[in-house]
UniProtKB/Swiss-Prot annotation:
ATP binds at residues 14-21. Component of the cytosolic iron-sulfur (Fe/S) protein assembly (CIA) machinery. Required for maturation of extramitochondrial Fe-S proteins. The Nubp1-Nubp2 heterotetramer forms a Fe-S scaffold complex, mediating the de novo assembly of an Fe-S cluster and its transfer to target apoproteins. Binds 4 [4Fe-4S] clusters per heterotetramer. Contains two stable clusters in the N-termini of Nubp1 and two labile, bridging clusters between subunits of the Nubp1-Nubp2 heterotetramer. The keyword Cell membrane does not apply. Its cofactor is [4Fe-4S] cluster. This is Cytosolic Fe-S cluster assembly factor Nubp2 homolog 1. GO terms for molecular function: 4 iron, 4 sulfur cluster binding; ATP binding; ATP-dependent FeS chaperone activity; metal ion binding. Keywords: 4Fe-4S, ATP-binding, Cytoplasm, Iron, Iron-sulfur, Metal-binding, Nucleotide-binding. Belongs to the Mrp/NBP35 ATP-binding proteins family. NUBP2/CFD1 subfamily.
Length: 260
């Protein structure tokens, strides 16, 4: 039930392990800090990490007459979360499903969850361009997907997959809001200097080549990793960090694009 959702944004990545879920959760927290009501939908059925990243593991979801009730992170209900992780008895349990069953579950997440009035719904997708992505696009045809943020790392093998992601967006008519380059350099936890351990600026070069916005470059920052397992925003804990700067830039960009 997406009728009360004003803006829907999908977060995509060409490969797994690029930090897409971390970007999704911290973006959701940053939007909430800016006064927006936010929903975060984790449709990475085989690797749901959002409950862990937000410290919500073990929380239960319930059904009401209007559908599933998402898990809220706060009493004010400013951030609602739904993930298959809430349906698994143990975090280690694998989801061994064929395509049709995955498709059915994603349709349920998109049509049977009682999302209240939201300014933004962030959809954290699995890596690649699979059945899950096609199902999401089909379900969003009526209400519309308002844009996609693509997360990549600077290595060439990751950038190759992002090119496929860009092609997927163009073929399905998704507006690309921009590319985020993650894990670009390592921030020393003692002196906070940044050292490039991989190549750098690949995201910016790809954004220029594809003629889409480059939203920013995020380094590997151990201080950000410590926030996993809580609902603490980087903007609160590390306001002077590069990560907070990039997230603030993305939020400001979204505020100029969308009318809340």
């Amino acid at each position: 039930m997406l009728e009360k959702v004003k803006n829907i944004i999908v977060v995509l990545s060409g490969k797994g392990g690029v930090g897409k879920s971390t970007v999704s959760t911290q973006l959701s927290l940053a939007l909430r800090k800016n006064g927006f009501k936010v929903g975060l939908l984790d449709i990475d059925l085989c690797g749901p990490s959002v409950p862990y990243l937000l410290g919500l593991e073990g929380r239960d979801i319930f059904q009401c007459d209007e559908g599933w009730v998402p898990v809220y992170t706060d009493e004010s209900q400013t951030l609602a979360v739904m993930s298959i992780g809430f349906l698994l008895k143990n975090r280690e349990d694998p989801v061994i499903w064929r395509g049709p069953k995955k498709t059915m579950m994603i349709r349920q997440f998109l049509t049977d969850v009682r999302w209240d009035e939201l300014d933004y719904l962030i959809i954290d997708t699995p890596p690649g361009t699979s059945d899950e992505h096609i199902t999401v696009m089909e379900c969003l045809k009526e209400v519309g997907c308002h844009g996609a943020i693509i997360v990549t790392t600077p290595q060439e093998v990751a950038l190759d997959d992002v090119r496929k992601e860009i092609t997927f967006c163009k073929k399905t008519g998704i507006n690309i809001l921009g590319i985020v380059e993650n894990m670009s350099g390592f921030v020393c936890p003692h002196c906070t200097s940044c050292t490039n351990i991989f190549s750098s600026n690949g995201g910016a070069s790809l954004a220029n080549y594809a003629q889409v916005p480059h939203l920013g470059t995020l380094p590997i920052d151990p201080r950000v990793g410590v926030l996993a397992g809580s609902t603490t925003s980087v903007l609160d804990e590390l306001p002077d960090s590069t990560t907070a700067e990039v997230l603030t830039h993305i939020v400001e960009k979204l505020k100029t694009i969308f009318v809340s």
